[in-house]
């Protein structure tokens, strides 16, 4: 008989830096997860992605065992690595610029986690994240133009 999922915990943790300290420890403790076992497994699985924030979805079963799925780093985190920072006032102050090729690379990386049917739609989602961070795409101010992606971007 299959195990019954009793709880799902979603967290964003720095890769290879999960510790029993807050905020990770209390969230896992409330769910009844063996904190030491989770941190050891998470740190081992994400060791190659050091420096990134990794979203993780932990399914807790009725026998207090668990399994977890790591996702790709958030688009905002990937854009921040390229640009260096986000803007506190995205409509007036621009934080930096990215190219369409960089947007495409992020979209291809995140494609499995995005609700998009093709790469163009995924690129538009990443472009929206860039807009909210005050980042221009190929010099195009997305708050004015709306999009820098042409229909033939594929």
Curated annotation (Swiss-Prot):
SUPFAM superfamilies (alphabetical): Ribosomal L11/L12e N-terminal domain, Ribosomal protein L11, C-terminal domain
One GO term of the biological process aspect: translation
GO cellular component, one term: cytosolic large ribosomal subunit
Modification after translation: One or more lysine residues are methylated.
InterPro entries: Ribosomal_uL11, Ribosomal_uL11_bac-typ, Ribosomal_uL11_C, Ribosomal_uL11_C_sf, Ribosomal_uL11_CS, Ribosomal_uL11_N, Ribosomal_uL11_N_sf
Role, per record: Forms part of the ribosomal stalk which helps the ribosome interact with GTP-bound translation factors.
NCBIfam families given in the database record: L11_bact (TIGR01632)
The protein's name in its UniProt record: Large ribosomal subunit protein uL11
